[in-house]
Amino acid sequence: MTAPSQVLKIRRPDDWHVHLRDGDMLKTVVPYTSEIYGRAIVMPNLASPITTVDAAIAYRQRILDAVPAGHDFTPLMTCYLTDSLDADELERGFHEGVFTAAKLYPANATTNSSHGVTSVDAIMPVLERMEKLGMPLLVHGEVTHADVDIFDREARFIDTVMEPLRQRLTALKVVFEHITTKDAAQYVRDGSDNLAATITPQHLMFNRNDMLVGGIRPHLYCLPILKRNIHQQALRDLVASGFTRAFLGTDSAPHSRHRKETRCGCAGCFNAPSALGSYAAVFEEMNALAHFEAFCSLNGPQFYGLPVNTGWVELVRDEQQIPENIALADDSLVPFLAGETVRWSVKK
């Protein structure tokens, strides 16, 4: 990577966790991802979740149809795990190159997760098949028991679900997605080579005070929820150390303005327009720009066993203001950092 004071040039990055939705929303948000990233791991939690090969093929085509001419972008599809999922269907999708990975949502942990897994035991035959195939398991790592405080869900998940699972299936490749706590950072750091993590820009930039002090900021509300600053710092320390099993996963999760700014607002930050520059700002603040390219462009392919992208992306130190709104059919989207000035932006 070359890093003059005003320009950062890196291999074209990938986004290892993104929500592209469907319909008009998909058509609106896809270009923000396809313009910058070579590949993206696409989450399967649509209103009708992606649980079959045919559904994944059809969804992939809808995504590709929304990619503007001139964008070189490959969506990597995932299978939504359910208690009743057919392991043979999953294996077929993996062998045919349709499914890159499978996603474990604990039931009711986040948006459109009501079809999710009620217990790991219920899907153990599927997980055993994945271990045998070398197929990565992507995990939303939170318990959803009513008696567990929302700020403790991730740490409790490690103790009660993640560690027993990994003890039982020691060769299973696992991505602990969008980690938010010092517990998770330490757990991944101490783990074996088949355990990795994605980290979002919002969890590196902000903590729960930013969301709650001086008024509630609904566009910082996501799941897992922002934690206290000691957890934010642990995530920053992890990426600044050059740890190679942590990589870029924006968890960009768009919702229309009226679904965010309401008495019961949805969780998710639409950060695709500004995520790469946000990561750059964090790495710069941490004096860790030497590790920026690896986090964005190298660590993910290494874990997934995929080639590094051949193209390049340049970020320039050019202060720009993030728009307040992005038009969406009969509504609008409020992007992450709306109205704020950012230091780094992708050169067009």
Swiss-Prot record:
Enzyme Commission numbers on file: 3.5.2.3
Active-site residues, record numbering mapped to chain: D251
A single GO BP: 'de novo' pyrimidine nucleobase biosynthetic process
Parts of the chain that traverse the membrane: none
Binding annotation for Zn(2+) 2: K103, H140, H178
Keywords, comma-separated and alphabetical: Hydrolase, Metal-binding, Pyrimidine biosynthesis, Zinc
Binding site for substrate: H19, L20, R21, N45, H140, L223, H255, A267
Alphabetized Pfam families for the sequence: Amidohydro_1
KW Kinase (keyword) present: no
GO MF entry, a single one: dihydroorotase activity
Record's cofactor remark: Binds 2 Zn(2+) ions per subunit.
Residues with PTM N6-carboxylysine: K103
Record's catalysed reaction(s): (S)-dihydroorotate + H2O = N-carbamoyl-L-aspartate + H(+)
GO terms for cellular component: cytosol
Keyword Zinc attached: yes
Pathway: Pyrimidine metabolism; UMP biosynthesis via de novo pathway; (S)-dihydroorotate from bicarbonate: step 3/3
Binding site for Zn(2+) 1: H17, H19, K103, D251
Cofactor(s), by name: Zn(2+)
Family of the protein in this entry: Belongs to the metallo-dependent hydrolases superfamily. DHOase family. Class II DHOase subfamily.
Function statement: Catalyzes the reversible cyclization of carbamoyl aspartate to dihydroorotate.
Oligomeric and partner information: Homodimer.
Protein name: Dihydroorotase
Organism: Salmonella paratyphi A (strain AKU_12601)
Gene: pyrC
